[in-house]
């Protein structure tokens, strides 16, 4: 057995042990107990909520917001989503939460910037949104005011967001493709809704809209000054040489087929979220991802570059 094969076998054995172990809560979030909370926790992990809404570098409290997201439009700060009534979402109703994720509108009727991936969360099923809401309501409340975004002058007016949404946003729940298998559809739901993979892995236009012709093809201007890799099955610039089993192992353990390991934001995504998903869901994600149209788009992910205001792919 060669080195790569041995590494994959070792990772697969480790995966089977971890998958059989109890799931530990990310950070200081409370573990779920009843079925709806357990479902909400699972979606919470799949969606990477902890990573975006917790300022880990500043040792911030779980889900209290404050983490910075640098983009070509300026710097966004993730909000407090704990059930604190004054600074979090404690005064929200369930329908406010559903509307925020389904339509990208806050309880006051203000439109959210698409830095909040409601453009993908809109595809979540109603029961999943309610479960996620129940789980967030069960977390400890933290009183921490939200920070003000630091945006370029042309991005400061929310009045333009209504027009942006009319041009680039299509709300609606994910509809299964009857021509595909149940596993494929489950993978599509996780990738295109719950885990919102395309929000990071898809290039954007100068308007901030996702490039539909290069979905998941990687980008030079990803979040937090990073270049995000092409994850389409293109054999030259993507992951077309990967096997489904190798991709599932990577999503659970961070170990690549070549023996290298995930780093940076992807390591965080795996550690806080994907590694807690069931093996059948990881296999479904792999099946779907490797069935996507291949897109030739070389992205040198080893390099880091500052994201400048107004710079796009």
Model-assigned labels for residue ranges:
Residues 93-107, 120-145, 242-262, 272-300:
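C-terminal capping alpha-helices of c-type cytochrome domains
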Residues 40, 46-56, 97, 132, ...:
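The canonical Cys-X-X-Cys-His
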Residues 52-58, 102-103, 137-138, 200-206, ...:
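Detector for the c-type heme attachment site
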Residues 8-19:
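Bacterial N-terminal signal peptides
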Residues 37-38, 43, 56-94, 112-126, ...:
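Gly/Gly-Pro-rich "capping" loops immediately C-terminal to redox-active cysteine motifs
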Residues 1-6:
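N-terminal secretory signal peptides that target proteins for export/translocation
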Residues 23-45, 163-192, 239, 309-313:
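Electrostatic cytochrome c docking/interface patches
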Residues 128-188, 203, 271, 281-290:
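Extended surface/linker regions that mediate inter-domain or inter-protein docking
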